[in-house]
Amino acid sequence: MKEIHVILSGGLSRRFGEPKAFARWKGKPLYQWCKQALGDDVLILSRPGLTERFIELGEKAVLEDIEPYRGKGPLAGMYTAMERAEGECYIFSACDTPLVRQETISALKRQLTPADDAVVPVADGRAQPLVAVYHRRVKSVLHEQLQQNELKISSFLDRIRVKYIEADAVGAEPWEFINVNKKSDLEEIEPFFPG
């Protein structure tokens, strides 16, 4: 099964005050921690104004959301990845989850069966749909949702066959799924840094 690894980094980062993807933590931009978990061969979903910065940092595969869905949130990024990069299995990580480990990503991929449209981890009782694995067949549902301007990821998940799996069932720690929304969050995740 051909896998496409995708970092979602097209958000506006309003609460953070600057593009989160490039915020430096432990010597490198946040998105590079996600890349470390996904592997070097990643597709980065960006937005106008940020694409050039990724290219300047040496990234080769950087896309912006397809018009007319630009600025429509993570569903647009997921759809764009599936529309522009041919694969069967898409592994997504939001750029603001720097603690996710490579072992966790590998374990989530192994959970996807032919009966599943997606594998979504659950940490501390909350689904984590932006650090998850999706089969290509969900692309049509993404398209329908975008066409109807129904941008809630929970609505999308309700329409597909999701295998929800507790983080500890795949050897993951709940803290791996903490996302950075404010600059102060960088200090709060410090105790969980494995290095």
From Swiss-Prot:
It catalyses: Mo-molybdopterin + GTP + H(+) = Mo-molybdopterin guanine dinucleotide + diphosphate. Keywords: Cytoplasm, GTP-binding, Magnesium, Metal-binding, Molybdenum cofactor biosynthesis, Nucleotide-binding, Transferase. Its EC number is 2.7.7.77. Its cofactor is Mg(2+). Its main location: cytoplasm. GO terms for cellular component: cytoplasm. It is an enzyme of class 2 (transferase). SUPFAM superfamilies: Nucleotide-diphospho-sugar transferases. GO terms for biological process: Mo-molybdopterin cofactor biosynthetic process. GTP binds at L8, S9, G10, K20, D65, D96. Mg(2+) binds at D96. One of its GO terms (molecular function) is GTP binding. It is found in: Cytoplasm. It holds the Pfam family NTP_transf_3. Belongs to the MobA family. Transfers a GMP moiety from GTP to Mo-molybdopterin (Mo-MPT) cofactor (Moco or molybdenum cofactor) to form Mo-molybdopterin guanine dinucleotide (Mo-MGD) cofactor. The N-terminal domain determines nucleotide recognition and specific binding, while the C-terminal domain determines the specific binding to the target protein. This is Probable molybdenum cofactor guanylyltransferase. It comes from Bacillus licheniformis (strain ATCC 14580 / DSM 13 / JCM 2505 / CCUG 7422 / NBRC 12200 / NCIMB 9375 / NCTC 10341 / NRRL NRS-1264 / Gibson 46). The lineage of its organism: Bacteria, Bacillati, Bacillota, Bacilli, Bacillales. The gene is mobA.
